[in-house]
């Protein structure tokens, strides 16, 4: 197989047409840009088939998209699937070298998750926060004991700063960032990411920030 890296995201569509990938890894914003680009061309050229337009934008071989670094909505995932592109979400961080979970493309019912935990990786939820223990977890931050103490508990669990939960099949779900929680006057914690994701599904909403 051949691995291609795009060092200039403004040229990603050019590189896709040049290298004709079968699998691509992008953040959700780029995936949304793909779908929007195809929708715009479809509207401008109603006489052209969706397959023809998709192949013009994304090449003839792309059939799988791996998303990370943010939430990939079910609506966006379905739009890509209608184009013949199966999606999957993964989760990781540099401190874990980097994988924590990987997508399972056979489980469409788990599309809202970020995949199942990788072998040897253990997760616990403390006050809503995802904490990880694995042989791949870092020993600490170089020459920064204070930051290391903040990131790794005394019993060796890495604090990710992300909120989420694990279901009974070891699929991991993300709810937002711990630092972003909004505490209401009644003491209830609200994750702005969950609100954003909910309204992002609405076709009348182009962009939203909470």
Regions found by a protein language model. Give the residues of each.
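Conserved ATP-binding loop and adjacent catalytic segment of the adenylate-forming AMP-binding
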Residues: 3-5, 74-127, 136-140, 149-157
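Gly/Ser/Thr-rich phosphate-binding loop
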Residues: 22-26, 34-108, 206
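Conserved ATP-binding/catalytic segment of the ANL
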Residues: 117-120, 124-125, 129-184, 189, ...
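Short acidic amphipathic segments
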Residues: 199-208
């Amino acid at each position: 197989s051949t691995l291609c890296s795009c060092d200039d995201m403004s040229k990603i569509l050019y590189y896709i047409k040049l290298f004709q990938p079968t699998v691509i890894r992008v953040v959700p914003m780029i995936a949304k840009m793909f779908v929007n680009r195809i929708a715009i061309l479809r509207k401008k050229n109603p006489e052209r088939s969706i397959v023809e337009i998709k192949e013009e934008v994304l090449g003839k071989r792309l059939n799988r998209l791996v998303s990370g670094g943010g939430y990939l909505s079910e609506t966006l995932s379905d739009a890509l699937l209608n184009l013949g592109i199966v999606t999957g979400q993964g989760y990781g961080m540099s401190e874990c070298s980097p994988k924590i979970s990987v997508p399972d493309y056979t489980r469409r019912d788990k599309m809202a998750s970020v995949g199942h935990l990788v072998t040897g990786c253990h997760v616990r939820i403390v006050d809503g926060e995802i904490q990880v223990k694995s042989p791949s977890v870092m020993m600490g931050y170089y020459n920064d004991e204070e930051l290391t103490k903040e990131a790794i508990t005394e019993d060796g669990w890495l604090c990710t700063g992300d909120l989420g939960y694990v279901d009974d099949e070891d699929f991991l779900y993300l709810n937002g960032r711990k630092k972003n929680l909004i505490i209401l006057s009644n003491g209830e914690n609200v994750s702005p990411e969950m609100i954003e994701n909910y309204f992002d599904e609405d076709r009348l909403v182009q962009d939203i920030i909470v």
